[in-house]
Amino acid sequence: MAFRQRLAKPLLYTTGAAALGGGVLYYTYRPRNIPGQDPAVVGPPGYGAEGSFRPPRFPKVRSRDDQIGDLKRSGGSKGAATGLFKSSEEAAPQNDADVYDLLVIGAGATGAGIALDAVTRGLRVAIVERDDFASGTSSKSTKLVHGGVRYLEKAVWELDYNQYALVKEALRERKYFLDTAPHLSSWLPIMLPLDKWWKAPYYWAGTKAYDFLAGSEGIESSYFLTRSKALDAFPMLKRDNLVGALVYYDGAHNDSRMNVSLAMTAALYGATVVNHIEVTGLEKDSNGQLCGARVKDLVQEKNGKKADEFVIRAKGIINATGPFTDSIRKMDDQNVKEIVAPSSGVHVVLPGYYSPQKMGLIDPKTSDGRVIFFLPWQGNTIAGTTDAPTKISYNPVAGEEEIDWILSEISHYLSPDINVRRGDVLAAWSGIRPLVKDPNAKNTESLVRNHLINVSPSGLLTCAGGKWTTYRQMAEEAVDEAVKTFSLSTKPVFNAPDVSGTEMVDDGARLDGSCQTHQVKLVGAHGFSKTLFINLIQHFGVETDVAKHLTESYGDRAWTVAALSVPTEKRFPVRGEKISALYPFIDGEVRYAVRHEYAQTAVDVLARRTRLAFLNAQAALEALPKVIDIMAGELKWDSKRKEVEWRDSKIFPPNHPSSLSHSFPISLSLLLSAFNY
């Protein structure tokens, strides 16, 4: 008996250690779901019996004019803007079915997400945007889909449950993000250099906690690199004091293309989606409750016509205007207290040789205690961001002080052999983060990137704050509140639209009237696979870099984009005329943007359908004449309209390389002198 007792304890310890070790090994090497690795739902095109090539055919969104027609019908015969309906009868359109359940103001990430959520719950939805989809903050992010590793550090050290909950929510949403749009998002390893040995266990524990919280929603476990391996992976690193590095995984995405895809998916599901239409006021009934909005079509003004003004009727109105949240709230109540604390985030774009193609870098402690990222993106390198209180403006610009600060910070951890020059900055931009105010916070960086939902006494539902990663969760909560506040009835969507183009829209989403956006694949996702670019090369004869770019920007819609590209009259490439010799953007993208994505201006194309203006301001300037000419052919612009486009065009981000100019925005005189146009 005594012998068995002496043996039991060591066996118990050994068994426990083996179980723990086995669990760690399984967690480390468990099977992962990598977006885009699954076979495409929509197969490649085939050939007819006679050998003719048959590309896939996809559904088109309704025309902008048709969408505006629906908006006008919601206002009925009394569609002229009045400011106040005298009675509910006077305000009612001829057909109550034309009244929208929800009118969403603002088509950034939050607004477009709300529109998609609501329409897939069977609600009648309209969404309007003063400028373009993602024209504000939503196109000016760091391009990360992240859980917020620095918020986890705060949660631990400050014992802040709210920070922990934010990280947990973001990690879950990160998985949904990559599942529903695998062509627009991917996993990115991010290196954290270590300059002291004692930091290794500290940050190792932090990254492992990040892995643990992600659970099955992660992809790869974080790992340690020795000094030599860190330099091999990131040769640009400074060698002095480098003792090693930790690498963890987060998501990366193409923010404005994601935003456009959200809006187009909502449109395909039946939402009325219109950009370049400005809300000039809110309409109330005789009881003081909101029942509509007055709007103005800004495209008409560009076309030299009087702006078309009319009223949109809806049972509920949602304010999702990001930094401009309070301006819409003041339309409802001029005395309302502001709830947004705007913060400026500046990024700069450098040539691709500043970073490896498939690994980013994070500096967790800059000279002033902030965090800075250094990431590969679209063949270039993004560095940023700053975080400082700012004033709200429609076109915020990146100041020289912020640009110099970023360049100074990145020079601290790059090799002395690399001279970080102001002239290397290809583009820079400033985005305004719509942080929710906390009266106890001393600075904007300490604010949690959380969101709030507020309903005014007159019925204006405002969704403010948040970040790209959690846009879907924000939208779900906003629609839940709207259904309750406005007494709306959701219903199953039995005749789901053929988004995939092959009657294979069944992507796992069961549209039963509840929120299903965690399963609704966005336009382009159904037929996407990692090998799709090979099919494009074989069928259309496009260049390899172009084919990869098209599949990673449009998913299965790359077939349509390639088909819209002109023949080159060369042996190779057979199709696709580049709008910039330095980047893989081609003429077919401009036509596709106009015909399928509601692009109305050259900036819509250069900044948000393609990303040329964000990648290289000089290249965007040089591409502008070609883009305007293609759009003029598509939209039937006359010479006056082209002149207006030249005059009004503002290349974003509105800052050039120092070799050109530091002034912004680009003026017509500069454009004309540059191109003799």
Where are these regions (language model features)?
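Glycine-rich FAD pyrophosphate-binding loop
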Residues: 119-140
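Extreme N-terminal leader/targeting segments of oxidoreductases
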Residues: 2-101, 120
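Glycine-rich active-site loop/strand segments that organize a redox cofactor
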Residues: 134-168
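Core beta-strand elements of the Rossmann-like FAD/NAD(P) dinucleotide-binding domain
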Residues: 98-100, 304-316
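N-terminal Rossmann-fold NAD(P) dinucleotide-binding loop
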Residues: 111-112
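Short hydrophobic core segments
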Residues: 105, 312-322
